[in-house]
Amino acid sequence: SCMKAAPMKEASIRGQGSLAYPGLRAQGNLETLGGPNDATRGLTSLADTFEHVIEELLDEQQVIQPSKENKDADLYSTRVMLSSQVPLEPPLLFLLEEYKNYLDAANMSMRVRRHSDPARRGELSVCDSTSEWVTAAEKKTAVDMSGATVTVLEKVPVPKGQLKQYFYETKCSLKGYAKEGCRGIDKRYWNSQCRTTQSYVRALTMDNKKRVGWRFIRIDTSC
């Protein structure tokens, strides 16, 4: 996020709900359609249906009240994965969030949005960011919803052994505009800075009394 003020002031973020995934099941195939024309109509229908499903996935949100004390970390997200090895792709929810943010910013019909890739128009982000999978061994500790520091457990026991906890973190890039302020802000009139903001994710942790449990902790999720 880009903080802008003259003089610089703090800004708060409203909490957003966590996303729920309804069950989906695809049926049929293009071979069951009645010819080339029907196949073309079928492809168009599938594309429209896919966009509709994405919007439904993102619109099904639970209302969660954020903590008043943590105004920069009041978003709820699902960027945690249990795996025996480093995940090769970003989490699905992250991709859906990025897609929805783009659709909201575009403010166009679904058909127009599909052909309006910002990369093709030469658009740039206000703040540059980097994203990567981080292990619990690298995080070691985190702050939970009560403000207490807890230990992030590296491994989670499962019936057939143990899996590692991975966190998909996004933070401001140390290169480029992050040091000079937000891109596109007139420096003659405004002071600005790119700042990493946090969200809550659910992870297996241990508190200072050695009690192990699933808690919401803060991780870096945007710039």
Curated annotation (Swiss-Prot):
<keyword id="KW-0732">Signal</keyword>
<dbReference type="InterPro" id="IPR020408">
    <property type="entry name" value="Nerve_growth_factor-like"/>
</dbReference>
<dbReference type="Pfam" id="PF00243">
    <property type="entry name" value="NGF"/>
</dbReference>
<dbReference type="GO" id="GO:0005163">
    <property type="term" value="F:nerve growth factor receptor binding"/>
</dbReference>
<keyword id="KW-1015">Disulfide bond</keyword>
<dbReference type="GO" id="GO:0005615">
    <property type="term" value="C:extracellular space"/>
</dbReference>
<dbReference type="GO" id="GO:0038180">
    <property type="term" value="P:nerve growth factor signaling pathway"/>
</dbReference>
<dbReference type="GO" id="GO:0007169">
    <property type="term" value="P:cell surface receptor protein tyrosine kinase signaling pathway"/>
</dbReference>
<protein>
    <recommendedName>
        <fullName>Neurotrophic factor BDNF precursor form</fullName>
    </recommendedName>
</protein>
<keyword id="KW-0165">Cleavage on pair of basic residues</keyword>
<dbReference type="GO" id="GO:0048812">
    <property type="term" value="P:neuron projection morphogenesis"/>
</dbReference>
<keyword id="KW-0964">Secreted</keyword>
<dbReference type="GO" id="GO:0008021">
    <property type="term" value="C:synaptic vesicle"/>
</dbReference>
<dbReference type="InterPro" id="IPR002072">
    <property type="entry name" value="Nerve_growth_factor-rel"/>
</dbReference>
<dbReference type="GO" id="GO:0008083">
    <property type="term" value="F:growth factor activity"/>
</dbReference>
<feature type="disulfide bond">
    <location>
        <begin position="172"/>
        <end position="223"/>
    </location>
</feature>
<dbReference type="InterPro" id="IPR019846">
    <property type="entry name" value="Nerve_growth_factor_CS"/>
</dbReference>
<feature type="signal peptide">
    <location>
        <begin position="1"/>
        <end position="5"/>
    </location>
</feature>
<dbReference type="GO" id="GO:0043524">
    <property type="term" value="P:negative regulation of neuron apoptotic process"/>
</dbReference>
<keyword id="KW-0339">Growth factor</keyword>
<feature type="propeptide">
    <location>
        <begin position="6"/>
        <end position="114"/>
    </location>
</feature>
<feature type="disulfide bond">
    <location>
        <begin position="127"/>
        <end position="194"/>
    </location>
</feature>
<dbReference type="InterPro" id="IPR029034">
    <property type="entry name" value="Cystine-knot_cytokine"/>
</dbReference>
<dbReference type="GO" id="GO:0030425">
    <property type="term" value="C:dendrite"/>
</dbReference>
<dbReference type="InterPro" id="IPR020430">
    <property type="entry name" value="Brain-der_neurotrophic_factor"/>
</dbReference>
<comment type="function">
    <text>Promotes the survival of neuronal populations that are all located either in the central nervous system or directly connected to it.</text>
</comment>
<feature type="glycosylation site" description="N-linked (GlcNAc...) asparagine">
    <location>
        <position position="107"/>
    </location>
</feature>
<dbReference type="GO" id="GO:0050804">
    <property type="term" value="P:modulation of chemical synaptic transmission"/>
</dbReference>
<dbReference type="GO" id="GO:0030424">
    <property type="term" value="C:axon"/>
</dbReference>
<comment type="similarity">
    <text>Belongs to the NGF-beta family.</text>
</comment>
<keyword id="KW-0325">Glycoprotein</keyword>
<dbReference type="GO" id="GO:0021675">
    <property type="term" value="P:nerve development"/>
</dbReference>
